[in-house]
C-alpha cells in the first residue's frame, strides 16, 4: 500500500512539474504556432486575391496589347501606303531629273566631242598647211617670192611717217629731251675745235664723271634739283671734278647741270650719250663709222645668241674692271675689232645700270646709226635677201618712216618666208611662221 501511495505521490509530483514547467512553454509554442498558421492563412488569402488581380490585369494587358497591336498594324499600313506614294512621287521626280541631266550630259559630251574633233581637225589642217608651206618655200625662188609679196603689201601701206627720235631720248620725258638736245648742240659746237685726241679725252672724262655720279646718288640728285639759279650746282660740280677732266668736258658738264632734268638718272644717260658722240665723231672723221656700226650690231646679235655671256657682262657682283676685261678677251678672240668699237662697248659695260647687256649693246648700235639721222630697222628673213630686195626694203621703210633707214639683216630658217621688221618698239611681222602660229592660236580651245 505504501508502495502505491509512494507511486501516486511520485506521479502527482511529476504531473505538477509537467503542469508547472512544461505546459506553459508548450502552450506558448502552440499559441505562436497558431498565430503563424493564421498569418500564413491570411497571406495565402492575400496571395490568392493578388493572383486573381494579376490574372485579371494580365487578361486586360493582353487585350490592350492586342488592341494596340491592331492599331499599330493599321497605322503601319497607312504609313506604308503614304511612304509608298511619296516614294513613287520622288522616284518620278528623280527619274525626270536624271532624264534631264542625262540629256544635258549627252549634249555636253556631244559638244566636247565636236570641239575636240574641230580642234584636232584644225591642228591637222595647220600641220598639213605647214607641210605644204615648207615644201613650197623649199624652192629658193618661191621663198624669195614670199619676200616680194610682203614688200608689195608693205609698199601699199599708207606712208604715215613716224616720228623718230634719238634712241636714248625714247625713255625720257619732255624736259629731259629738251635738255639732251641742248647738250648735244653744245657738244657739236665744241667738237668743231677739237682734234681726235681731244675728243677721245673728252669721252674718257665724261665716262669717269658718269661713273662718279652713278656711285654718288645724293650728289646726282642735288645736281638735278630744278632751280632757277644754277650757280650752286655748277660750284659743286667744279669742286668735285676740277683738275680731273679737261676744259671741254668741264664745259659740257657745266651745261648739263644748268639744264632741267625730269629724272636724276637722265643726267647720267645724257653724259654717257655725249661721250659716245665724241667717239663716233672720231670714227666719222677717220672714215670708220660704217665699220663701227656694223661691228656694234654684230656684237649685239652675239650677245642675243649667247645669253650666258650677256649675263656675265651684266653681273654687278663682279667689279666693272673684271667685266670689261672679259669683254676685251672676247673681242680679242674675235680677231680684228675696231678700237673705237672696243672703247664704246667698254664704256657701255662700265655704265650698265640694270639694263641687260644685249639690250645696251643694241641701243649703242642704234645710237651710232641715229647720229647720222638714220633709223635702224632689224629685219629677219628665212634666207639672205638679194641686193634688189635689200634696196627695196630700204626704200620702202625710208618712205614709211620719213628718214633714211639702215637695215640690219638676220636670217632664221624657222621663219619659212616673208619678213619681220622691227623699228624701235614697232614690229611688222609678215613671216609665214607667224601666220601659221596665228592660225593655230585661233583654233577653238
UniProtKB/Swiss-Prot annotation:
Task: Give positions of region: ATP synthase subunit b.
Answer: 1-168
Q: Which InterPro entries match?
A: ATP_synth_B-like_membr_sf, ATP_synth_b/b'su_bac/chlpt, ATP_synth_F0_bsu_bac, ATP_synth_OSCP/delta_N_sf, ATPase_OSCP/dsu
Main location per UniProt? membrane
Ribonucleoprotein is among the record's keywords: no
**Keyword annotations:** ATP synthesis, Cell membrane, CF(0), Hydrogen ion transport, Ion transport, Membrane, Multifunctional enzyme, Transmembrane, Transmembrane helix, Transport
Membrane-topology descriptor: Single-pass membrane protein
Family per UniProt?
In the N-terminal section; belongs to the ATPase B chain family. In the C-terminal section; belongs to the ATPase delta chain family.
Quaternary structure and interacting proteins, as annotated: F-type ATPases have 2 components, F(1) - the catalytic core - and F(0) - the membrane proton channel. F(1) has five subunits: alpha(3), beta(3), gamma(1), delta(1), epsilon(1). F(0) has three main subunits: a(1), b(2) and c(10-14). The alpha and beta chains form an alternating ring which encloses part of the gamma chain. F(1) is attached to F(0) by a central stalk formed by the gamma and epsilon chains, while a peripheral stalk is formed by the delta and b chains.
Tell me what this protein is called. ATP synthase subunit b-delta
Source organism phylogeny: Bacteria, Bacillati, Actinomycetota, Actinomycetes, Mycobacteriales
Gene, per the UniProt record: atpFH
Amino acid at each position: 500500500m505504501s508502495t502505491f501511495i509512494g507511486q501516486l505521490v511520485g506521479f502527482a509530483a511529476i504531473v505538477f512539474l509537467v503542469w508547472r514547467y512544461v505546459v506553459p512553454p508548450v502552450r506558448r509554442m502552440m499559441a505562436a504556432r497558431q498565430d503563424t498558421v493564421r498569418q500564413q492563412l491570411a497571406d495565402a488569402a492575400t496571395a490568392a486575391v493578388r493572383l486573381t488581380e494579376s490574372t485579371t490585369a494580365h487578361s486586360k494587358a493582353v487585350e490592350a496589347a492586342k488592341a494596340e497591336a491592331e492599331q499599330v498594324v493599321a497605322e503601319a499600313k497607312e504609313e506604308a501606303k503614304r511612304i509608298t506614294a511619296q516614294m513613287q512621287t520622288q522616284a518620278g521626280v528623280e527619274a525626270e531629273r536624271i532624264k534631264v541631266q542625262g540629256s544635258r550630259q549627252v549634249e555636253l559630251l556631244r559638244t566636247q566631242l565636236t570641239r575636240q574633233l574641230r580642234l584636232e581637225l584644225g591642228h591637222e589642217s595647220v600641220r598639213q598647211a605647214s607641210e605644204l608651206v615648207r615644201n613650197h618655200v623649199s624652192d629658193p625662188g618661191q621663198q624669195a617670192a614670199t619676200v616680194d609679196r610682203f614688200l608689195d603689201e608693205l609698199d601699199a601701206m599708207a606712208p604715215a611717217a613716224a616720228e623718230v627720235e634719238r634712241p636714248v631720248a625714247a625713255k625720257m620725258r619732255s624736259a629731259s629731251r629738251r635738255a639732251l638736245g641742248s647738250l648735244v648742240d653744245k657738244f657739236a659746237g665744241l667738237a668743231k675745235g677739237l682734234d681726235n685726241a681731244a675728243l677721245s679725252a673728252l669721252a674718257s672724262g665724261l665716262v669717269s664723271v658718269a661713273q662718279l655720279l652713278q656711285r654718288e646718288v645724293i650728289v646726282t640728285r642735288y645736281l638735278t634739283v630744278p632751280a632757277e639759279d644754277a650757280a650752286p650746282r655748277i660750284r659743286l660740280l667744279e669742286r668735285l671734278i676740277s683738275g680731273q677732266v679737261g676744259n671741254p668736258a668741264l664745259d659740257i658738264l657745266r651745261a648739263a647741270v644748268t639744264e632741267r632734268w625730269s629724272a636724276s638718272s637722265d643726267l647720267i644717260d645724257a653724259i654717257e650719250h655725249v661721250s659716245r658722240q665724241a667717239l663716233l665723231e672720231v670714227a666719222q672723221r677717220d672714215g670708220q663709222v660704217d665699220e663701227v656700226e656694223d661691228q656694234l650690231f654684230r656684237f649685239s646679235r652675239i650677245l642675243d645668241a649667247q645669253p650666258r655671256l650677256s649675263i656675265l657682262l651684266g653681273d654687278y657682283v663682279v667689279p666693272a674692271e673684271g667685266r670689261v676685261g672679259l669683254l676685251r678677251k672676247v673681242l680679242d678672240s674675235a680677231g680684228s675689232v675696231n678700237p673705237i668699237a672696243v672703247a664704246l662697248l667698254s664704256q657701255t659695260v662700265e655704265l650698265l645700270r640694270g639694263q641687260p647687256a644685249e639690250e645696251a649693246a643694241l641701243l649703242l648700235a642704234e645710237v651710232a646709226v641715229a647720229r647720222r639721222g638714220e633709223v635702224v630697222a632689224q629685219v629677219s628673213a628665212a634666207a639672205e635677201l638679194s641686193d634688189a630686195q635689200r634696196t627695196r626694203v630700204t626704200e620702202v621703210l625710208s618712205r614709211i618712216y620719213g628718214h633714211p633707214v639702215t637695215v640690219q639683216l638676220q636670217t632664221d630658217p624657222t621663219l619659212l618666208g616673208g619678213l619681220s621688221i622691227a623699228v624701235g618698239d614697232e614690229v611688222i611681222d609678215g613671216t609665214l611662221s607667224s601666220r601659221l602660229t596665228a592660225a593655230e592660236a585661233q583654233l577653238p580651245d
